[in-house]
Swiss-Prot record:
Component of the NOP7 complex, which is required for maturation of the 25S and 5.8S ribosomal RNAs and formation of the 60S ribosome. The lineage of its organism: Eukaryota, Fungi, Dikarya, Ascomycota, Pezizomycotina. It comes from the Eukaryota. Belongs to the WD repeat BOP1/ERB1 family. Component of the NOP7 complex, composed of erb1, nop7 and ytm1. The complex is held together by erb1, which interacts with nop7 via its N-terminal domain and with ytm1 via a high-affinity interaction between the seven-bladed beta-propeller domains of the 2 proteins. The NOP7 complex associates with the 66S pre-ribosome. This is Ribosome biogenesis protein erb1. The keyword Phosphoprotein does not apply. One of its GO terms (molecular function) is ribonucleoprotein complex binding. Keywords: Nucleus, Repeat, Ribosome biogenesis, rRNA processing, WD repeat. Residues 1-138, 303-353 are annotated as: Disordered. It comes from Aspergillus terreus (strain NIH 2624 / FGSC A1156).
Length: 784
């Protein structure tokens, strides 16, 4: 009886099924923790009148019983006579509830007795079938019961692990080729095509897992009922609170220094003073053992000098475009070239490979001739003879042409002799008359002024406009008459300044008045012709005030005139209106002084290079040079043909000038071009359409360039926005084997930069090596 009671305390078999309240558990599953939790949860439901079974349940689990339970393991075998005792004990625990149920199946034990390897009894318990009130869940047949063990450990065995009873879990059968084909045709529900690494079986997903994957794939929220756009509750900003969130007073530790920290700091300070705490030093290597002697085999090794006859190997040439893995299309051979290369003998081929396009570097295969090329390279290095070639030590200065000294090229202007002041605002244009006595200027104040060149005294002035500036002023060439042409706004004014002797003044007025009779003989234009934009304008007489001042005729062009240039005979002059809104048919106009006639030679815009900028007549041929923004075109007026196109290569041409001795015995056609991109270009038209020389000496745009007229002095000058003028010596010869000689002579500085503008125009004295400049600072200067 004693043994049986002891066994009943250790292991109890459930003798009935608990339907509603699981108050009794088997001895293997019930422990102190389960008991405390069960009693605490059902404390309110228990009545004060507890039955005997509950008292017996508490008595069975005493301290002594716990000690005995620790001594007996689930795999230990009880002695004979314990089983009846255990059955009676379990019956006593059930109490009167067991008497109410008469089912014989409930009285069966939940274990069976088998013999182990030693011939002793072993208890094998049945699998627990939990109900709704149990902590256990249903056993999943597909669950991994072998633990967290990689299946690769069992690759050499027919099983994949062991279950809780120590039996082998055999490897699941794999589908053959026919099963795989059927699965691919009829995909089973939950099929993924993957294998579960924990069980070795096909991985199947539940409907919830599939729905979760679908939501993740569709970028939806996986969690049900989650609202990512809930209204923001600004707890601390939406309502103004009067009382503070915490009215606790500030602790003293926040504003009183800590005494504890002060003590620790003083200890550290004292240790530093006593030398017990030293500053940090980087760790050094441990001192080597002096007894160990290390020998350096290469201590006395000296570099071996090269052999006296040593010649370094020549370097391989760098690879070209044809050796690239992605060469340009023009390097790729076509079918005809590839066939010809393949049919050619390998020794006669120009190159040992054909270029190929692989698209990317990772697609480039191995080079089949790599070993062969390296072998031939080695053969060349030790079989081919080498020769030393001495390098030519050439002084770079010796390659430059020897230019004459500027002292040998005098005279040329070097100093400022006279300053002309009187204009309000910028002085845009300047011109010296053919006699070299008077100087005409025009500026932003709309006045045209004539000065005495040597003294700087103003002789004559006229107000041509209150709003527009005088953009260009030019004297008529020739000494038989004195006529001054000025472009102001969209009008051209022809004036005879009353500064000459009466006979010359009378001849000048008669020259202009002769055209009025010729103009009167022409039929007047109709109303339809007047409405056309390309209708030539009619010359008109000036107002009485302007006529009294010396203005004789006005030409209304309807567009702003920027440049004006006379023909060498003095009967024609050409004007250019470079505005972007100016029609192409009226941008360039040629005027005849003796007939008071204006003509538009171009009906269409010049192709390429933008709108026209300036134009000049050839000094000895019936050729008109017209420059737009990028090119200069030469037109033969007699044959009405395009003769030549000059390409300076500049971005925006500002001005150009023709050499006065062009097409004579002294030389061919030569022109100089100034551009807004700070370049001065010399063109020899018989040599090339491209520039012969390009000079870049200015820091800002070049506004004007000019040759010395007459060809007496081989000089030319340019004016720039950097406030300086540069004088050059440019000589041309009749020898076709020699080129023009260009020598920089002098940089003239005197104008002030105003509004990012410097020197706007420059002109030469007809007989002397003097030049006159007009600046944005409102002054003109004579340089001698």
């Amino acid at each position: 009886m004693v043994n049986a009671s002891k066994v009943s305390k250790k292991r109890k078999a459930v003798t009935r099924d608990v339907e509603e309240e699981a108050g009794v558990f088997s001895g293997d599953e019930l422990n102190a923790e389960n008991l405390d939790g069960a009693l605490s949860d059902n404390a309110n439901e228990l009545s004060s009148d507890e039955d005997d079974s509950e008292v017996e349940l508490v008595d069975e689990f005493s301290d002594e019983d716990d000690e005995d339970e620790e001594e007996l393991d689930s795999d230990e075998i009880p002695s004979d006579g314990e089983e009846p005792k255990k059955k009676s004990a379990s019956t006593a625990v059930d109490g009167p509830q067991a008497d109410d149920e008469s089912s014989s199946e409930d009285e069966q034990p939940n274990f069976r007795i088998e013999k182990d390897a030693n011939g002793e009894d072993r208890y094998i318990y049945d699998e627990i079938n939990p109900d709704d009130n149990s902590d256990y869940s249903d056993v999943d047949e597909n669950a991994n019961t072998i633990g967290n063990i990689p299946l690769k450990f069992y690759d050499e065995y027919p099983h994949i692990g062991y279950d809780i009873n120590g039996k082998k879990i055999m490897r699941p059968a794999k589908g053959e080729a026919l099963d795989a084909l059927l699965d691919s045709i009829e995909i089973p529900k939950g099929w993924t095509g993957l294998t579960d690494p924990s069980t070795g079986k096909p991985l199947e997903l539940s409907q919830d897992e599939l729905e979760l994957l679908r939501k993740v794939q569709m970028n939806e929220i996986p969690e049900e009922g989650y609202d990512p756009y809930e209204p923001l509750m600004e707890w601390f900003s939406n309502k103004q609170e009067i009382m503070p969130l915490s009215a606790a007073p500030e602790p003293k530790r926040r504003f009183v220094p800590s005494k504890h920290e002060a003590k620790r700091v003083m200890k550290i300070v004292k240790a530093i003073k006593e030398g017990r705490i030293l500053p940090y030093k980087p760790p050094t290597e441990e001192d080597e053992d002096k007894d160990v002697i290390n020998y350096d085999l290469w201590a006395d090794e000296a570099e071996r000098p090269d052999h006296p006859m040593h010649v370094p190997a020549p370097k391989l040439p760098p690879p070209g475009y044809e050796e690239s893995y992605h060469p340009p299309p023009e390097y790729l051979p076509d079918k005809k070239e590839r066939k010809a290369w393949e049919e050619t003998d390998p020794e006669d081929r120009e190159q040992e490979f054909l270029p190929n396009d692989f698209g990317s570097l990772r697609k480039v295969p191995g080079y089949e001739n790599f070993v062969k090329e390296k072998f031939e390279r080695c053969l060349d290095l030790y079989l081919a003879p080498r020769v030393r070639r001495s390098k030519l030590n050439i002084d770079p200065e010796s390659l430059l042409p020897k230019l004459p000294s500027p002292e040998e090229l005098k005279p040329f202007p070097t100093t400022c002799a006279t300053v002309f002041r009187g204009h309000k605002g910028r002085v845009r244009t300047v011109s010296v008359d053919p006699s070299g006595v008077w100087l005409a200027t025009g500026g932003d104040d709309g006045t045209l002024r004539v000065w005495e060149l040597l003294t700087g005294r103003q002789l004559w002035t006229v107000k041509l406009s209150d709003e527009d500036a005088v953009n260009v002023v030019r004297w008529r060439p020739g000494k038989d008459a004195v006529v001054l042409a000025a472009g102001v706004g969209d009008d051209i004014f022809l004036a005879v300044p009353p500064i000459v002797d009466p006979e010359l003044e009378k001849a000048s007025l008669e020259l202009i008045d002769a055209g009025w009779g010729y103009a009167a003989s022409r039929p007047p234009p109709t109303a339809a012709e007047e409405n056309k934009k390309n209708t030539p304008p009619q010359w008109i007489r000036p107002s009485a005030a302007l006529a009294d001042s010396g203005v004789c005729a006005v030409i209304p062009l309807r567009y702003v005139v920027k440049t004006l240039s006379w023909h060498r005979r003095g009967d024609y002059f050409v004007t250019v209106c470079p505005g972007s809104s100016t029609p192409a048919s009226v941008a360039i106009s040629i005027h005849t002084l003796s007939k008071h006639l204006t003509q538009f030679p171009f009906r269409k815009r010049i192709k390429g290079g933008g709108p026209p900028q300036t134009a000049h007549f050839h000094p000895s041929k019936p050729i008109l040079f017209v420059a737009n923004q990028r090119t200069i075109r030469a037109y033969d007026l007699s044959r009405q043909l395009l003769v030549k196109i000059v390409q300076p290569g500049a971005r925006w041409i500002s001005s150009f000038d023709i050499h006065p001795t062009s097409s004579t015995a002294a030389g061919g056609d030569n022109i100089i071009v100034g551009s807004y991109d700070r370049r001065l270009l010399w063109h020899d038209l018989e040599l090339s359409q491209r520039p012969y020389k390009t000079l870049r000496y200015h820091r800002k745009a070049i506004r004007s360039v000019k040759f010395h007229p007459g060809g007496r002095y081989p000089l030319f000058a340019d004016a720039s926005d950097d406030g300086s003028l540069q004088i050059f010596h440019g000589s041309v010869t009749g020898d076709m084997l020699s080129n023009a000689s260009i020598v920089p002579l002098k940089v003239l500085k005197g104008h002030k930069i105003t509004g990012e503008l410097g020197v706007l125009d420059v002109d030469w004295h007809p007989r002397e090596a003097w030049c006159v400049s007009a600046g944005a600072d409102g002054t003109c200067r004579l340089w001698m």
